[in-house]
């Protein structure tokens, strides 16, 4: 598919708050105890926040390793997964008798220090770095979430993904008395609902059995790590939308959203956790149980943009996939030029592949400020546009007087490409040929990526393909524009099309979407507001916002 025509800010360091749960008398500054009936939530008072970090999707990590510094291992694992979530970070550890949870808004390096990590002793830990898919960016919504099961027992949980039946699960929690009617809830995420239902089910059985009963009723994309005082659990939804891998340490086991998270702690890759599989790891080893039949639909955008290039997905190198996409893009959308440059970092491998295939020289035409986060995940449009200028700067001596092929990973809103084309022209480029290493993004994602409403997607302006391409080209100001085909992108992944989700490109969603449920980021906030007005959760269906509606349905 090719058209040719003639012409982050560092968050302030918050005062850290430790929640020690599982032993009476160990809770700090309890200010409310209002939300979950027999499973009380203890909220530590939060300092004032002024948070504007960039966003990505979440990363989860877990380790079971007696005799190891599990909190530090988890810290390093989260460091490797920082690109997946930059709003908040947290770690939970357990030593066989209690669970300790520490979390705050900010990057992993902002939330944790040596003193904090040294105080978190145990043999099992989970960690989470957050990008919000459901619920606002608040301290309460940081993870891991914690719920009491019984006196001296509890469960901590971290979640990567996004559920599509949150309203249904919240109604079930409400019917069980797990959601307060009028008192503001300390957390408003689908992850919090899962934690509440899991703890509620474990009150009358084991945590493992409660999970096996709950998970088949959960719909959407989810990779979970959760734990009690002794055991680490990890599971993946039946479609395997998001990645999750198992690794081996000399004295234990590790799970991580990406294999790069295993590498950083010296764990050897064992295998991917299968779709529909629950793992339990304790002193008896690793137990595997199927809670649903697998129907693999891995997110193809993980290959294009989300995952680290040094990770592998379903046995395929992410870096290798991106280079191959670039080669195919060169064959599908050739153009005469003097130099190929990539938009760092995720556009660089595809640019290398394009240069290799086309025979046109590759050069570094853009410098990236490593301390500014990704742009399509910034919390507001104004900051997105500012962030592009902050993060990229052209090397004028490299590009002046040249015809450039500029390779980027994707076009969502078009802000990056529009600002980039303007900068490169000002720096002296005589022609700008933009090539995109993914097809046009035309549909929102309901499974955990920050794609906006259809009206905000630049490729969704018109239905006709050629008119759309011309509209996007004009919108970003390029001389020519070319996208790789859907077929070419899938072929580069070396995965069968039947095992991938590419709904953001073709609108075919593998996981059934509820016809009436509000799928927006603030679905739980809306439900609580309805309850405050006297409307019951069972009345919510009549008050839902339709799937193609207004700004309340921010597509996540």
Swiss-Prot record:
EC identifiers of the protein: 2.4.2.14
Catalysed reaction equations from the record: 5-phospho-beta-D-ribosylamine + L-glutamate + diphosphate = 5-phospho-alpha-D-ribose 1-diphosphate + L-glutamine + H2O
Domain Glutamine amidotransferase type-2 intervals: 58-284
Keyword Magnesium on entry: yes
Biological processes annotated in GO: 'de novo' IMP biosynthetic process; purine nucleobase biosynthetic process
Keywords: 4Fe-4S, Glutamine amidotransferase, Glycosyltransferase, Iron, Iron-sulfur, Magnesium, Metal-binding, Purine biosynthesis, Transferase
Active site as annotated: 58 (nucleophile)
UniProt propeptide residues: 1-57
Signal peptide start and end residues: none
Gene Ontology MF, one: amidophosphoribosyltransferase activity
Pfam family, one: GATase_6
Amino-acid positions noted as binding [4Fe-4S] cluster in the UniProt annotation, renumbered to this chain: 299, 445, 501, 504
Listed pathway(s): Purine metabolism; IMP biosynthesis via de novo pathway; N(1)-(5-phospho-D-ribosyl)glycinamide from 5-phospho-alpha-D-ribose 1-diphosphate: step 1/2
Cofactor binding remark: Binds 1 Mg(2+) ion per subunit. Binds 1 [4Fe-4S] cluster per subunit.
Cofactor(s) the protein requires to work: Mg(2+); [4Fe-4S] cluster
Annotated family: In the C-terminal section; belongs to the purine/pyrimidine phosphoribosyltransferase family.
NCBIfam families found in the cross-reference section: purF
Biological role stated in the UniProt entry: Catalyzes the formation of phosphoribosylamine from phosphoribosylpyrophosphate (PRPP) and glutamine.
Name assigned to this protein: Amidophosphoribosyltransferase
